[in-house]
């Protein structure tokens, strides 16, 4: 498997030893979590943003990815538009508001970025078929994405989803050729079912089990810099598993490492009031979020009670001097429908949380008035229009 010049292997976050790219099940020395590492001195900003980095999709940033674009399993994920939201700019009273519309990825979700990296790594194994089946638990979007990218390699995949998962996710997991198990209950039940129901060994595509899913999320940071010519001041990120916060924060830090920028922006994790383990841990000064005992959010994508990347997300927020806010479901859904009405972009319910978080900041007078603000829309509104429409009907519209 060809690897990029700057990639220095998978480093163990516990003992520091370095393992090859195709290591499975954590650090061979101590079992710790593995993280892609790079020789940053070998990367020039021009490698990322100059003429050689031209192309479509996030693989144009392969100078800071483990594998070259020529090896990528890709459907041109990334290169999503940064849409100026003029009404929101006026209403929030800031310099500029942009929506980074991740709904326009191949399967309509930001998770396509990481899945493309994870499956590219699988393709580089000596015998990818020996890894079958690939499996993960998902609230919906990542399961759909996994089925799509695994299908590209012709590998069998299982997505375990809770029964509440959106119909579009369930249907398209099968349409992409993936196998699906619908598990009664909530997301933790689906997560437990992977081990309970799969009789064989499997290759885990779970976030943070593979070192590559949150790694793929970091290209959001690179694209924001490429499109704005500078970093934004504040980025609102809907938060569930922690992989987006951890990944995007790493992307901002790497831009400092290679000398493209001097400082990182403020990153804000937004969670539902009724399921906010990462926000609660951040507010209480805990390193590791406690599982959320009684989740009750309409937004299934954000109902992750015991996030696999919870500690990583909290750590990233602290490193970047970030913030965390919680928002009511009605505000998230109301924000998503307001954006659809006035800004054209179809935000999913989870994406609406980013807009609701920005409104919360506005109401708390937390903006100074000249910021460039980015709202990350993590999913297409076309995935669950019923949830959005129900919200309007509930208001008599
Ligand atoms: Zn180790």
Region locations from a protein language model:
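PLP-dependent amino-acid enzyme catalytic core
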Residues: 1-397
